[in-house]
Each structure stands twice: as C-alpha cells, then as structure tokens.
Regions:
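Internal metal/ion-chelating core segments
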Residues: 154-218
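A composition/biophysics-driven feature that prefers long, compositionally simple stretches
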Residues: 1-176, 200
Length: 218
C-alpha cells in the first residue's frame, strides 16, 4: 500500500486573526507588487518571522521543514503532519500537510504548489544550501531569487495595528517585570521567580488576546 505524500486536515474552525483583513490584504498587496517587479511566479517563505507575518502561524520545527507559498492568487502553508489541523485553523490562507511516509515529502508538497513556475523567490538568509539544492531538484525548470532583504524592508515599516501590538507587548513585559519584583525575596529560587513572572504575563496575554495560541501551552 502506497501512503500519501500530502494531505489536508480541516478540523475545527478558522481562529479569529490578530490583525484585520485589511491589514493582511495590505501585506499581500505589497508582496505581490514585489513579485510583479521581480517577475516572480511565486514565493516560498521558510522562516519563522515571514510565515508568521504573512500567515499568522508560528511553527515549532520539531526537526521538520515548514513553508508558506504565495502566488498571485493563492496563499498556502506547508506544514508537518505532527501539527494536524492547527496550521489551517490559525493561518489566514490554505494549508497543505506533508506526511512522514517518504523522505523529503516537504519538497513534494512544494513541488505540488509551485510546479511550472519559471522564477520563485526564497529566503537566502534562512534557507540552507542543502534545502536549496533539493528545491532545484524538484523544480528543475525554475530559477530562484533571494527576496529576504526586500521583504525585511517591508516588515520594518509598521502599520498602526502593528504599533498597537508592540505597545501591548511592552505593557505585558512591564507587568511581568513588576511580578518579578514582587516575587523577589531572600531564599526564593530563581526558577520560582521566573515562573511567577512568566505565568503573570501569559495570563495578561490571554486576557488581551483571547483567541491567540499561547506558546508552550498547547
């Protein structure tokens, strides 16, 4: 029996995004303008920051590859089966899961999404040389171009919604710092102080962003 290389798991419902649809549309409009200028048929993001920036899903690698494919008419994350349906629920776009049944199924999934592309943008500051060679193998007719610096410049210009998120993050950090001071006492172990501070911040994040995924709690 031949096991599948890719599959889809759409259990549950899409989770409300932290940023508005208008905010996300502006990001994709900017990235697709870049694609137009550089004559790219698609982009494969692989870094934590860009996948989170464009899809709202923050992955934990578990030794596996993750990606986000952006074309002129599609947004699709490529994730490991270990995450199940969470990337689809959290992400703003589609989701394609690769299985562990065969080696390098991640690249089979990328091939499925980008087959026929003449030019694809990738992140040279994150993509390993080994993985770049594997991409060239599954997409032999495709040229690859580095878009990491240009996309970084896009992320540096903060919107009002992003500034508001940064302010909230700073306020949460202040609350955590105050909790740390409150817990300080002679003979109290450092790990207890850190745990109290972290727990206080997690509670505050949950209050401010009730639909968020809290790291290390799922």
């Amino acid at each position: 029996m031949i096991q599948p290389q890719t599959l889809e798991i759409r259990n549950g419902e899409k989770i409300p995004a932290i940023f508005s649809k208008e905010e996300m549309d502006n990001r994709f409009q900017a990235i697709r303008s870049l694609m137009e200028v550089q004559k790219l048929d698609g982009i494969l993001f692989t870094s934590f920051h860009n996948i989170n920036y464009f899809d709202h899903f923050l992955y934990t690698a578990f030794g596996r590859n993750y990606g986000l494919v952006v074309t002129r008419d599609r947004i699709c994350s490529v994730t490991a089966n270990i995450d199940g349906g969470q990337p689809w629920r959290r992400g703003v776009g589609e989701n394609l899961i690769y299985t562990d049944w065969q080696r390098d199924n991640f690249f089979a999934a990328v091939q499925e999404l980008l087959k026929g592309s003449q030019k694809v943008g990738v992140e040279y500051d994150h993509l390993s040389l080994q993985n770049l060679e594997k991409l060239k193998y599954v997409l032999p007719q495709t040229d690859f171009a580095d878009i990491s610096e240009t996309v970084m410049q896009q992320r540096m210009i903060k919107s009002e919604e992003e500034i508001e998120l940064i302010r909230n993050g700073a306020q949460v950090a202040d609350i955590g710092g105050q909790a740390c001071v409150e817990a300080l006492a002679e003979g109290v172990p450092e790990y207890l102080i850190a745990r109290h501070s972290t727990h206080t911040m997690v509670q505050e994040i949950a209050k401010r962003y009730p639909d968020s995924d809290l790291m290390d709690t799922w």
